[in-house]
Amino acid sequence: MSHKFRFSKESRERLKNFLLGDWYKTKGDAPAQETENPQPQAEAVSAAQGENAPAKAPGKSIAVVSRTDIGKMRKTNQDALIESTELRLYGVADGMGGHNGGETASAGARDGLLELLEGKEPEQGALRTAIGAVNRRLFLQQKGDEQLSGMGTTLTVLWLSDKCVYIGHVGDSRAYRLRDGELKQMTDDHSVVAELLRSGMLTPEQAATHPMRNVITRAVGTEDGIEIDLMCEERRAGDVWLVCSDGLYGMVGDEKIAEILKSYKPKKAADLLIAAALEGGGRDNISLVILLDKEGEQ
């Protein structure tokens, strides 16, 4: 995500006010992209890729597959996959920042979260505390190193207990759930364009090529404090979960993602999703984790 930017809350409000003015009104024919669902309570397949065999946790079975690809236009892969069958923790961090800042931030988020959650039972409080601590670490690290100035990362993770999927989310990576054939976006994008969409100031057609579409409004490590979205969703047998960076959903629409997840087992689906993102342009790093819940609540 080397071309992502992060806006402060104050800058975001100034931007909204600006866009409500006459300048924005002249842009009504700006082209197009995707909607965001409201949230309740391959050139080559994989330059680097990982895959876990079905993971057996106490009383619960989960099939897990992950993939990451540098894409067609980036020189480095600043995404990090988060996978621990022992913790039942899975997710994606999509880094940003010059020099090695993006890679440092995403790897730091991954490693810090795995360290801080080791031995913990899944619950929202522990997840909130761990993400907050990771944020503080990365913030202090970039403040102490000029070359890392401005670095940060998105972070979207699933942490599974026997009955619940706890979701922790900051930024514009996404968590989706496929249940009973219906794909649902479980997280809200923390981005300028997503906020404008939610407020009705942009149409989906205007959003796709909006000049601010790569500006995120929250990231891990960019400020001393952080606002984290936390959710708890009931596990159900047959659910398919997808966590991905914007390098996937920015190139592949939700309808196509749903079609692939419904039609193929996780391993094949992961390969096809990477291939579709590359075929769609591969403009960013592409990372994803797919979970098939075999033994959630019946």
Regions inferred by a protein language model and the residue ranges of each:
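PP2C/PPM-type serine/threonine phosphatase catalytic domain
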Residues: 1-298
